[in-house]
UniProtKB/Swiss-Prot annotation:
It comes from Vibrio parahaemolyticus serotype O3:K6 (strain RIMD 2210633). Residues 38-256 form the Radical SAM core domain. Its EC number is 2.8.1.6. Keywords: 2Fe-2S, 4Fe-4S, Biotin biosynthesis, Iron, Iron-sulfur, Metal-binding, S-adenosyl-L-methionine, Transferase. InterPro entries: Aldolase_TIM, BATS_dom, Biotin_synth/BioAB, Biotin_synthase, Elp3/MiaA/NifB-like_rSAM, rSAM. This is Biotin synthase. Pathway: Cofactor biosynthesis; biotin biosynthesis; biotin from 7,8-diaminononanoate: step 2/2. The keyword S-adenosyl-L-methionine applies. It catalyses: (4R,5S)-dethiobiotin + (sulfur carrier)-SH + 2 reduced [2Fe-2S]-[ferredoxin] + 2 S-adenosyl-L-methionine = (sulfur carrier)-H + biotin + 2 5'-deoxyadenosine + 2 L-methionine + 2 oxidized [2Fe-2S]-[ferredoxin]. [4Fe-4S] cluster binds at residues 53, 57, 60. PROSITE patterns: RADICAL_SAM. GO terms for biological process: biotin biosynthetic process.
Length: 350
């Protein structure tokens, strides 16, 4: 099967209508043609700045517009981020993702963010950040610091998007993806299933992703985690078979991409997760929490991988024998060398 960038809604709907087993069989054939079988890439996601986000994403408990149990937190100090990254590496993660609840980062944030990137890279981990919208210059700064991936989800179809978010446009998201690509970074972009969207909207999301000039290197498919206090807390649950179908179709449409089984895994039993891996998912987030939502523990994941004969992929960055204390010393030196009086503990929530 060739890699394409001209998918139509009709083609995706045809895939949706295929018998379930036939669809999974096709997806598995594509997966075996383009991907390493029985291997899953493992990432860890850390919230480096939580809550008080000015945006109105109806699914998100970090929005300042909704009353949830999430308390706002300042930008995490670099040393704490590196400590979490070291623990993630020790637990088997190969990529460390850092997320901040912002509409976009401010210039005062950039030195701290670049120090985080450099410190995590020194550990031999791949790096990823999700910080909201970026300007071209901010994208270049992150790339120059060594950031490997930037996550910026499209969330849903262009047609349904306005029902979920009004504080930034769909084009804003596409523009940020262009800035990231132009800066030389890899793209992580996907969406959320279960927000009340139609089958046509799910098809539209995949068409938008698959028809980008270059497919995202990572495509996270999230199942909505309903949080009390958000406008979507009472939306209907996603049918598991519909979700698995979306994984399979994403694999068929974007055969070279990593398809990540992302948020919502805590609500999936082992059988559903196994079918997602059969359908072509080959990446997961690892650890007990994804930003602010629950995630299966490392032990549960390792037990499932063992049952399925799945081995997590090895670290793809250069091996690094630097001790944790030396890494922290490097960060302290970088901070001390900055021509600024800004404190690492400034309140980034305002």
């Amino acid at each position: 099967m060739e890699v394409r960038h001209n998918w139509t809604h009709a083609e995706v709907r045809d895939l949706m209508e295929k018998p379930f087993m036939d669809l999974l069989f096709e997806a598995q054939l594509v997966h075996r043609q383009y991907q390493q079988t029985n291997h899953v890439q493992v990432s860890t996601l850390l919230s480096i700045k939580t809550g008080a986000c000015p945006e109105d994403c109806k699914y998100c408990p970090q929005s300042a517009r909704y009353t949830t149990d999430i308390e706002k937190e300042r930008l995490m100090e670099v040393e704490r981020v590196l400590d979490a990254a070291q623990k993630a590496k020790n637990a088997g993660s190969t990529r460390f993702c850092m997320g901040a609840a912002w509409k976009n980062p401010k210039e005062r944030d950039m030195p701290h963010l670049t120090d985080m990137i450099k410190g995590v890279k020194d550990m031999g981990l791949e790096t990823c950040m999700t910080l909201g919208m970026l300007t071209p210059e901010q994208a270049k700064q992150l790339a120059n610091a060594g950031l490997d991936y930037y996550n910026h989800n499209l969330d849903t179809s262009p047609e349904f998007y306005g029902n979920i978010i009004t504080t930034r446009t769909y084009q804003d998201r596409l523009d940020t993806l262009s800035h990231v690509r132009d800066a030389g970074m890899k793209i992580c972009s996907g969406g959320i299933i279960g927000m009340g969207e139609s089958a046509n909207d799910r098809a539209g999301l995949l068409v938008e992703l698959a028809n980008l000039p270059t497919h995202p290197e990572s495509v996270p498919i999230n199942m909505l985690v309903k949080v009390k206090g958000t406008p979507l807390e009472t939306v209907d649950d996603v049918d598991p078979f519909d979700f698995i179908r979306l994984i399979a179709i994403a694999r068929i449409m974007m055969p070279q991409s990593a398809v990540r089984l992302s948020a919502g895994r805590e609500n999936m039993n082992e059988q559903m997760q196994a079918l997602c891996f059969m359908a072509g998912a080959n990446s997961v987030f690892y650890g007990c929490k994804l930003l602010t939502t629950p995630n299966p523990s490392e032990d549960k994941d390792m037990m499932l991988f063992k049952k399925l004969g799945i081995n997590s992929q090895e670290v793809s960055q250069k091996p690094d024998e630097i001790e944790e204390n030396e890494l922290l010393d490097r960060v302290v030196e970088r901070v001390a060398a900055r021509p600024t009086k800004d404190d690492l503990f400034y309140d980034a929530s305002v």
